[in-house]
Each structure stands twice: as C-alpha cells, then as structure tokens.
Amino acid sequence: MTSRKAVALHAAYLIVLALTGAFLLLLVAFQHALAAATESITVKWKSPVSDTVCLAMSAGGQYCGIVDKEGAVQIYGPDGKLLWRQIVKGATDVLIARNGQSVLVYSKLNPVYQEVCFFRRDGRRLWTHKVDGCVWSGAVSADGMRAAVTTGERYIYVYKPDPNRPKYRRWRLEGIGYSVLFTPDNKRVVAATWQKSRLACYDLDGKFQWRSECEPDRQYELHASADSRSILGVIPGTQYKPGAELRFWDSGGKLCWRQTLDGFDAHALVSPRSQYVAVSYASYISKKGEGIIERKVAVYQSDGRLLWEKGGLFFGPRLMALSPTGASVIVSDGEHSIYNLDRRGKILSKLDMAGGIRKAVSSEDGRRILLHCGDGWLYLMGVGQ
C-alpha cells in the first residue's frame, strides 16, 4: 500500500512538473511575441518627395514637414495627406507646433534672407518678420503658443504668432545663440551661446533665470527631456576636429555629468523621463597602417554611467530614436536597414527599406520616425504600433 502511494505521489509530481514546464514555455513564448509586437517597426504612410534639405515633426509626431532644395515647404497631416505646399524664398528650416497649429519657416545663416515666416495649419501666411542678423537657430514651444529664433547679432526673438495680433520680444544674449529650445512645460527658453560659451535660461518675458558656464568656443546642440527635468548638450565634432562631447544638466542649470567621446558625427537623444541618454558617433581606428571609420551606439544612465555600447567595423549604427522608457534604441546601418536594439544591444527587430536612408528625425517619445529615402519617398515609421 505504501509503495502504491509513493508511485501515485511520484506520478502526480511528474504531472505537476510537466504542466509547470509547459506553462513556463507558454509564458516565455507569449512574452517573446508581446516583445516582438511592442518593438516592431512598421510603415504608417509614405509620400513621394523631391530632394529635401530639412525634415520636421510636431511635438507628438502627428504632423510632419519638409523643405526641399527649391525652398518649397510641405506640411503633412496625421494620415500622410499633403495639407499644403508653399514656396518660401531661401527657406532651409521648418518647425511645427503641436497639432500643426503654427509653422515657422526660416533661412539658416543666410545674409540675404533675414526673415521669419509664420503659417497657420491651413497654409495661410500669418506674418513675415525681418530680424536683425542671420538666423542661427529656431524653436517652437510644445503648446504652439511661442516661437523663438536667435541671430548673428546676438539677439533672441520670442514670438507670439497670434493670427489677429502677432507680437514679439527680443533681448541680447551674451554670445551668438548657436542652439535654442523651449522647456517642454512652455514656461522658459534656453539658449546655448557660442564665443562666450554658456547655457542661459530666461522666462518668456526675457527675465534671466540661470546660467551655466562652459569652455570657450563650444557649440552645443540642445535637447530637452519631455518631463522638463533635464537638458542634453551635444558637440557633434568633425573629421578634422574630433572630440565629440555630451553634457547633461538638470532643469536648474546644474551640470550633472559630461562625457568626452573620441570621435565625431555624434548624434544624441535624452529619453522623455530623463533616465537615459543614447548617442551614436564615428571614430578613426588604424588597421594595417590605414585609417578606417568605425561607428558605435552607446546608452548612458542619467548619472552618466555607461550601460552598453555596440558597433564596430561590420555594423555602423546611426541613432534614430530612443523609446520613452529607454528600453530600446532604434538605429540605421547608414544604408537600407533599421534596427531596434534592447537594453543589452540585442536586435529585437529589423526592417529593410527600398532605398538608402538619407535623412531621419524622430518624435520626442521615439514612437514615430520620419525618413527620406533614396527611392524618392518620404516615410513615417511607427515603432511598436
């Protein structure tokens, strides 16, 4: 009797073990399927375009825009439909506010066209304003209520492009405004100045808030996190003057960390919740007496610690987007393919485009990517949708 009970208990144990194993296998398979669906890259819409000099997306990624080599500005709606097309002489850059409610167009570093043009969502021109000096940089606030440009005469202009009564304020910076942005809470404007290199923050009326000093002649491209808690500065570096650099400030202008990269062509993004910074860059390595370009992508935590780095001679990643949680990084190989990498640098998904990838810009949450490819098409990509 005792022997029979032992056999029965052993059989029951084996059955439970088998069921548990089957359940775990199903759970793993489900998680893999869920991850594949969450991290997949798909084409949302596409539209034929000519050669572009600028790509832009609104906050939230609902509206997209381009400027082509002829100065034609084209704005697209959420479904990819062309909403309007306007020729703006000398245009090189377009910026779009959330929901497409205002569009800012200007010609960068052009002494002939020192004008800023504002359009409504329907393409009607609201206002054209001549500024003092060449335009160096521009920004639109996330709520669409303000726009800003900096000029070579060290001015910053902050506009309120109201269709009935447009107005602006301007004040002088302590150097040329190389890059400018609005904080995502729409309450402040931050400029990175050249020559007298520093970050300077003001309220929308021009009242000084704080400054952070930098070494002379630094030119930082600025990015703000969507939670308004941090600001990322990037020096891309060039082949002739390598030495790319990252700087990470808190919302009060305190420098939290900096990272010098032995390379050039750096592009970096900060995650919406400020936990991660991703960067791709190129560097020269010597192989058999020849200089060869090697590319890498790296992800850092908010305290500056390196999480992972991937790349090399046989895989040259270019950063395209960073997911909201920092769980994945989307890169291209500089040719036809797009990859989604997880926190360990493992490939989650891949998509091959019909033409070589020429330009790319992402939404602030990393869920949409606008591409111009060599096949003559403009693509809006969705990540995990």
Located regions from the model:
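Repeated scaffold domains used in trafficking and secretory/extracellular systems
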Residues: 51-56, 90-96, 134-139, 176-181, ...
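Short, solvent-exposed loop/turn segments at conserved positions within beta-propeller repeat blades
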Residues: 109-113, 194-195, 238-243, 288-293, ...
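Blade-level signature of beta-propeller repeat domains, shared across WD40, Kelch, NHL, RCC1
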Residues: 354-385
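Surface loop/turn motifs at the tips and blade-to-blade linkers of beta-strand repeat domains
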Residues: 46-50, 85-89, 129-132, 170-174, ...
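Short loop/turn segments that connect beta-strands within beta-propeller blades
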Residues: 77-79, 120-122, 161-164, 203-207, ...
